[in-house]
Amino acid sequence: MAPNLLTIGLLLTLIASGQAHLNIFLNLHEVLRLIGVSAELYYVREGAINDYALNFAVPVPANISDVTFTWQSLVDHPLPYSINIATSDTEVLPRPILNISRIGDVPVEPQTWGIALKCSGTRNAEVTVTINVEVILDRATNNNTNLIFKRKKICLREEQDSAHEEYDDDDLDLLQTARKGHGGDIHYVDRNDEHVVANGHQAPEKQRPVVTESPVGRGNSGGSKRDFDPMLRENLVPPASGLVTLIVGGILALVLVSTLILIAYCAKGPSKRHPSNGVHLIKTSSFQRLPTISSTAHNSIYVCPSTITPTYATLTRPFREYEHEPEEFNRRLQELTVQKCRVRLSCLVQEGNFGRIYRGTYNDCQEVLVKTVAQHASQLQVNLLLQESMMLYEASHPNVLSVLGISIEDYATPFVLYAATGSVRNLKSFLQDPSYARSVTTIQTVLMGSQLAMAMEHLHNHGVIHKDIAARNCVIDDQLRVKLTDSALSRDLFPGDYNSLGDGEYRPIKWLSLEALQKSHYNEGSDVWSFGVLMWEMCTLGKLPYAEIDPYEMEHYLKDGYRLAQPFNCPDELFTIMAYCWASMPAERPSFSQLQICLSEFHTQITRYV
C-alpha cells in the first residue's frame, strides 16, 4: 500500500509541476504608482490565470508615460513568446515602444519589461491600449497561452509642448530604470522594428516571495507620482472648457440631419432623375455610376422572375467566429493533425515573400496541395496560416476545397494539406493565362458562377461567412470544375489585391461591400457583394477591379453610387445579376439560392440558341 501511495504522490507532484509553467505579474513598484496599493498583482501565478485581473483595464494617468510587466518561466527552459500592441486612437497615442523584442523567449529568471506610452499632445483623450501576449508552453502539443492586457492611458493636450522634446531619451530611460534589479539584457525595440538599438547587462536577482498586501500606505510613500490616485476622478484634469462639448454636439447634430436628408433624397431621387425603367449608366473606364436597381422593376435588360427579394434583414442564424475561441481552434488542430513523414512534396506551384504552395502526395497515393511557409516566416504569420486554413473546416461540399490535414511537428514550418488532383490550379492564375482562359465561353462562365453560388449557399446554411470571396481564393481543374477555398497565404501570394487604410490591417478593399469598408461588418450580404466582383473577374479574365481608384477613395466612390462597369462581351443579363449583388443595403441584395435560380434561368435561356 505504501509504494502505491508513494507512486500516486509522485504523479501528483509531476502534474502540479507541469502546470506551474509561468508567472506574469505587476511588481510592487508598478502597482503602487498605478493603483496606489503596495502589493504584487498576478495575472498568471504558477500557470493559473487570474481572469478578474485580466478583465480590469488599468488606468494610466497623464503623468505616467510607461507601463511595465514582470514575468518568469517556471520550467527548466525559456518559453517562446510574441507580443502585439494596438491603440484605439493612433493620433493621440501614436507609437507605443517595447523595450524587448516583439518575438523572443520568457527567461527562467524574473525579468521586467516595459512599454513607452507617449501621447502626441494633440488633444485630451482616454486611449485604450491592448497588449496581446502569446506564450508557447509546449510546441509538441500546440499548448499556447494567449493573454490580453488592457490599459487606459489618459492623454492631455497640455503635453504637446514637451511631447516631441523628451520622447526619445526620457521614455527609454524610464523603461531602463524599471528593469534594473530584475536582470536580463536591456533592448529598446520599436513596435514595428525589431532592430536592437541598445544593450546592457544587469546581474539577475532571485525571485521575491509573493506579497499579497502591505501595511505601507500612500501617506508614507511621498512624491507627486504616488500622491496621484488614478481611481479618483477629481484628480484627472478636466477638458479646457464646456465649449468643446457644445461644438462637438452641434457638429454631430448637423451630420445626423444631413445624413437623413441624403437618405431621403437617394430614396426618392432615381424615379425623378431616371424616368425610364432601364438601367442608365455613366461610364468611367472600368467603373460606372449605377442607380438603385429595384427588385420589382421590369426593364428591357433582364430581371430574374420574382426571385430578387430582400432576405437578409430577418436572418437570425448564428454565425461561427471560431477564431475567437481558442478551445475550438485547438480541437480542430488536434483532429486534423497528420504525420509529416507521410507527406512528400513534388514541385513548387506558387511562391510569395514567405508563403509557399507545393504539389505533393499523402501516404504515397493521395494527390494534395500543400500550403506552408519559409523558415524566415514569423510566428504571427505561421499562426495566421493555421487559423485561416481552418476557416472551411468540415465544409463537405463538391465545390468547397477544405483542409484535409495539418502537420505541426515542426511548428515553424507547418504543412497544410488539401485534397487536389494534379490538374487543379488557382482560378486567378488560370484566368490570366492566355492559353487557357480565352477559350472559356459565356455558358461556361455562367456554370462556374453557379458552382460557386452553390458552395456559398452551403457555407451560409452552416453559419460560415467567408469574408474574402475572390478568384484568388478559388481553384479550377481541366474540366472547368471550380471550388471555393480559404484565404490562407493570399495576402502574401497576391499582395496587389490587399491594401491597408492606415490601420495596419491588409484587407481586399476592392472586393469589400460598403458596410465592410465602413464598419468592418461582414454578413451574408457582404459575401454576395464579393461574389458579384468575382463574377466580374471571370468575365474580364482576372483584371483588378477598380484599378484606377485609390484604396482610400473606395468608400467615397461606392457611397456616390459608382460600381464596376459592364465588361466587354458580357451579356446584359449576366451583368444585371452582378449589379443586384452591389446594392447599397445588404437586405436589398439577393441570397445565393436566388442567384442560383437567376444563373440557371439565364443558362437555360442562352443554351436554347446553341
UniProtKB/Swiss-Prot annotation:
PROSITE patterns: PROTEIN_KINASE_DOM (PS50011), PROTEIN_KINASE_TYR (PS00109), WIF (PS50814)
Positions glycosylated per UniProt: N63, N99, N143
UniProt binding sites for ATP: V349, Q350, E351, G352, N353, F354, G355, R356, I357, K371
GO molecular function: ATP binding; protein heterodimerization activity; protein homodimerization activity; protein kinase binding; transferase activity; Wnt receptor activity; Wnt-protein binding
Signal sequence region: 1-20
Main localization of the protein described in the UniProt heading: membrane
EC nos: 2.7.10.1
Tissue specificity of this protein: In the embryonic abdominal hemisegment, expression is restricted to cell body, axon and growth cone of a cluster of 20 ventral nerve cord interneurons. During muscle growth and attachment events in the embryonic abdominal hemisegment, expression is in somatic muscle fibers 21-23 at 10-13 hours and 2 patches of approximately 15 neighboring epidermal cells (dorsal and ventral attachment sites) at 6-13 hours.
One Pfam family recorded for the sequence: PK_Tyr_Ser-Thr
Membrane topology: Single-pass membrane protein
BP GO terms, sorted: axon guidance; axon midline choice point recognition; axonogenesis; canonical Wnt signaling pathway; cell surface receptor protein tyrosine kinase signaling pathway; chemorepulsion of axon; dendrite guidance; determination of muscle attachment site
Active site: D468
Side Extracellular, residues: 21-242
PANTHER family: TYROSINE-PROTEIN KINASE RECEPTOR, TYROSINE-PROTEIN KINASE RYK
Domain observations: The extracellular WIF domain is responsible for Wnt binding.
Protein name according to UniProt: Tyrosine-protein kinase Drl
GN (gene name): drl
